[in-house]
C-alpha cells in the first residue's frame, strides 16, 4: 500500500473510531488493527496519538473550510453546504459531537478542534466581509459565533428532535425542519 494511501486510511479509521468510541477509549493498536497495518506504521505517519488526533481534526477543519468556501457565498447556501457535508460524512458528526460535548476542555486547547474551527470561521468571515457576502455592521466575533451556532446547533439538537418526533408517532416527512439562530 503506498504511503499516502496508508496514511489516509489510518486517519479515516481513527476518525471513525474516535467518533464512535471516544479518543480516550481507542488505542494506537486498535487504530492499527482496524487499518490493517502495524502500530509502527501509525507511529511513523503520526508520531503519537496526539499527532493522530491533530491529523484527524485537520481533516475536519479542511472539510468545513471547503463547505463554507465553495459555491455561492450567501448564508443559506453556506449553511446548506455544511449540513450536506455532515450528511455525507457522518463520522465527522460523531467525532464533533463526542469531542465537543464529552471533552470541551480538550476541544478548547490551543491545538483543539474548537480552537481551530473558530480560527477558520474567523478567516472565512473576513473573506466574506471583504467580498460583500457578509455584513460589516455586526462584529466578526458575532458572525463567527452565529456561523458555528447554526452548524453545531443542528448537529447537537438533531438526535433529540428525531427522538421526540418518534415518540410522537409522527411520520418523518411531516417533521418540522430544525433551524438554530441567535438573537
Question: What label would you give each PLM region?
Answer:
Residues 145, 149-157:
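An amphipathic alpha-helical core segment
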Residues 53-60, 117:
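Alpha-helical DNA-contacting segments of helix-turn-helix folds
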Residues 84-87, 118-131, 156-183:
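C-terminal peripheral helix-coil segments that are non-catalytic and often amphipathic
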Residues 46, 98-104:
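Short helix-capping/turn signature of helix-turn-helix
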Amino acid at each position: 500500500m503506498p504511503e499516502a494511501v496508508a496514511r489516509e486510511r489510518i486517519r479515516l479509521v481513527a476518525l471513525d473510531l474516535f467518533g464512535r468510541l471516544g479518543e480516550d477509549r481507542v488505542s494506537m493498536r486498535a487504530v492499527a488493527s482496524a487499518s490493517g497495518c502495524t502500530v509502527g506504521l501509525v507511529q511513523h505517519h503520526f508520531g503519537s496519538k496526539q499527532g493522530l488526533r491533530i491529523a484527524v481534526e485537520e481533516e475536519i477543519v479542511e472539510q468545513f473550510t471547503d463547505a463554507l468556501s465553495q459555491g455561492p457565498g450567501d448564508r443559506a447556501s453556506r449553511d446548506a453546504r455544511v449540513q450536506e457535508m455532515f450528511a455525507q460524512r457522518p463520522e465527522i458528526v460523531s467525532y464533533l459531537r463526542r469531542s465537543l460535548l464529552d471533552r470541551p476542555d480538550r476541544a478548547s486547547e490551543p491545538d483543539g478542534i474548537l480552537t481551530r474551527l473558530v480560527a477558520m470561521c474567523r478567516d472565512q468571515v473576513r473573506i466574506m466581509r471583504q467580498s460583500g457576502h457578509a455584513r460589516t455592521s455586526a462584529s466578526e466575533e458575532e458572525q463567527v459565533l452565529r456561523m458555528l451556532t447554526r452548524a453545531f446547533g443542528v448537529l447537537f439538537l438533531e438526535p433529540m428532535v428525531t427522538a421526540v418526533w418518534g415518540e410522537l408517532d409522527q411520520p418523518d416527512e411531516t417533521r418540522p425542519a430544525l433551524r438554530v439562530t441567535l438573537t
